[in-house]
């Protein structure tokens, strides 16, 4: 996990240096020519996306990025393309590059958080989920923060996040839980938070408290299969 992020960090540093060197050495284009080239590449990008040709779309985005190094839109589009094609390392690199310039870029925070999570770098994904919640008030980002804190055995932080979530969860907030290999069960956020609270207690051998939390989760959503299975572990 640490090695994965170290490689990402080295790649970011090398990429920034290479990009700066390349930008410094590029000749200045006539504004009209630049606008024409931009319009041509943007049109080609749109056509490539319409035909699901991501390779050409990425190529055009790179051309646009080189020509317009200060326009973050092209990096954002590239990060989305990488993420959608499950190239999580590349998605993380681009989004982290964006965040170096603007740490409050919501799209980049989302892609960085989920990409780093997919790469197994949970300790690096966590601050991005936390920032997302602070900036947007999104309860799912808070749930992800709590679950990662629990996974990292940072139980006090996880419990604080869970208690915040129990208070702020809305009726239409849902979390998906796997029911089978092909089926997902949608559970209310408050019930999901109580289930996570039970898991935190369970990890600390606080069986009575865990049992109470699981029972509360089931009372909110009687069809909550995972909470029922977790409840059995308290007997």
Language-model region placement:
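N-terminal leader/linker segments that initiate helical-solenoid repeat arrays
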Residues: 18-73
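Short coil turns that delineate tetratricopeptide repeat
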Residues: 69, 103, 136-137, 170, ...
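TPR alpha-solenoid repeat register
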Residues: 74, 108, 141-142, 174-175, ...
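Canonical tetratricopeptide repeat
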Residues: 77, 111, 144, 189, ...
